Amino acid sequence: YLDNEALSPEIVASIEQRKNRPGWWAVYGEGRLGEVEGKIYKDWEIIEKIPHEARLVRRGLDFGYSNDPTVIVDIYEYNGGFIVDELAHQTGLSNRQIADIIKSREDRVLVMADSAEPKSIDEISGYGVNIMGVAKGAGSVQQGIQFVQDKRMSVTARSVNTIRCYRNYLWKTDKNGKVLNEPEHTFSDPMDAIRYGLNGYRTRPNTPSGISDQRRKQIQRSRYSATVS
């Protein structure tokens, strides 16, 4: 990391705070090859573009403002898995600006957001965005993480912040180095947005996955024609 002049002081400080994690430090501090100890998500595929057959099913929104960025991600269903595409990762965004980013997209799907910001959700809804808060409760974070872990996940190459956070999203450890069942806050923002976006989502039954809405409508029309003929 010392050879990368593009890193901000905040990222450098975050890296150096993890010197006490040998596995992580060996990979990201000293540049050795290997797997990061305590990494929450693994084996995500980085893809150059979203397949034409992929279907946009949700958007995830994690609120931030001054210290933490606001993150918006598109989530596509494709061939039994999900594809993540980063729309925004920026500090200082107002609710109006968040709504404008979402409404600038041609496709309109449900936005799932952090329910800790009910006033922001109401305001963004008032700007014409289909948005709702994610229900939270005991164990909901761990359940959401497990749901994502169980899926085949891909992320677009242009989603540079999401990829960086995916690679650095770790479980907390205690003073003895024991891994705990709680994620670190550092690098969590895009991961939270993804978890919110997939909250409560299930693949539609009897619906062919990995095909576009246009193709799905063609299939439905052909079935109808066969029925009436």
Model-derived features with residue positions:
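Short, structured patches in soluble enzyme cores that scaffold and shape functional sites
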Residues: 1-3, 19, 31, 74-76, ...
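ATPase catalytic-site recognition across NTP-hydrolyzing enzymes
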Residues: 4-64
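Non-catalytic, well-ordered alpha-helical scaffold segments
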Residues: 23, 69, 188-191
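Short, well-ordered loop/turn elements at secondary-structure boundaries
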Residues: 53-55, 66-69, 105-107, 149
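A conserved active-site cap/scaffold subdomain adjacent to cofactor or substrate pockets
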Residues: 56-61, 65-73, 85
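Mg2+-dependent endonuclease catalytic cores in nucleic-acid-processing enzymes, primarily RNase H-like
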Residues: 73-74, 78-186, 204-213, 217-218, ...
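Stable alpha-helical structural segments in soluble proteins, enriched in small hydrophobic residues
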Residues: 189-201
